Amino acid sequence: MSNRAESFLVGLVGDGVMPSLTPHMHEREGDVQGLRYLYRPIDLLELGLPGESVGELLQSAHRMGFNGLNITHPCKQLVLDHLDEIAPDARRLGAVNTVIIRDGRFTGHNTDFSGFAAALASGLPDAKLDRVVQLGAGGAGSAVAYALLTAGVRHLDLVDTDAARCAERAAELAGFFPDSSVTARTTAELPQLMPLADGLVHCTPVGMAAHPGAPLDLSLLESRHWVADIVYRPIDTELVREARAKGCEVLDGGRMAVGQAADAFRIFTGLEADADRMRAHFLELVAAEEVTA
């Protein structure tokens, strides 16, 4: 183990963040790398603070010596007005989930998109990317779609129950990636879309413990499809289980969660995290939750 002298104080700002696994992943990786690394959840609900207080919290974090903050709902857009600099990809997405505090300046990044991109590259390195169907065009869905197009997807069919949001998101993404086609679709079109698709990406709450079930008719899955889910509580969603049973290559939601954490760790410390080690720890944490549930 290294005898590094560096110490880091970081935090997670958002509603209901106390159960988050992110602090545990960061602190364990810091320990292994020989850092003094403390990661504190800052739960707005417990503090009785609105999302609009994020600017004040940034200033307080600076005064108290924080090196950076992760930002989650409802502050990913609200934080934008309080930053000195925003990374180009985060600016395009209109959302920041990681802020580095250095020399009194606040710089915003988005590791939602980079975390999924890293997960896709490591977990499904040989995935065909000609045509992909994505379910969900909300905040996380926007970042994932951006990552897919950055990775080289040529035709992205974006499906969301909110037709207006879906159309707006598709138009934005098409403007950023003129060499790819991005089309807003409806769930009614899935029986026609899936036979043409190489892969399926799921970015809605369906499958979470509080929203059980599958996000589409699972009979539409074929063994030739690859399937990615961003839900990780539980890690084996109904979609993930059925896709594996059909012989699909599968990327579970834990991959993106670890990818986000590893990239944020790098931004905060300047050191590369060991993503495989972080995933092993993440799976330990999830398994422990399932035992106590």
From Swiss-Prot:
Q: In which pathway does it act?
A: Metabolic intermediate biosynthesis; chorismate biosynthesis; chorismate from D-erythrose 4-phosphate and phosphoenolpyruvate: step 4/7
UniProt-listed CDD domains: NAD_bind_Shikimate_DH (cd01065)
GO CC, sorted alphabetically, is: cytosol
Q: Which GO terms describe its molecular function?
A: NADP binding; shikimate 3-dehydrogenase (NADP+) activity
Q: Which reaction does it catalyse?
A: shikimate + NADP(+) = 3-dehydroshikimate + NADPH + H(+)
Catalytic EC class = oxidoreductase
- At which positions is shikimate bound? S20, L21, T22, T72, N97, D112, Y232
Q: Which residues form the active site?
A: K76 (proton acceptor)
Q: EC? A: 1.1.1.25
- Tell me which Gene Ontology terms the entry assigns under biological process: amino acid biosynthetic process; aromatic amino acid family biosynthetic process; chorismate biosynthetic process; shikimate metabolic process
Keywords of the record = Amino-acid biosynthesis, Aromatic amino acid biosynthesis, NADP, Oxidoreductase
Q: Give one Pfam family, short name only.
A: SDH_C
Q: Which residues bind NADP(+)?
A: G136, A137, G138, G139, A140, I230, G253
* Subunit-level organization: Homodimer.
Q: Which family does it belong to?
A: Belongs to the shikimate dehydrogenase family.
What this chain does, per the entry, is described as: Involved in the biosynthesis of the chorismate, which leads to the biosynthesis of aromatic amino acids. Catalyzes the reversible NADPH linked reduction of 3-dehydroshikimate (DHSA) to yield shikimate (SA).
Question: What's the protein called, per UniProt?
Answer: Shikimate dehydrogenase (NADP(+))
Q: Which organism is it from?
A: Arthrobacter sp. (strain FB24)
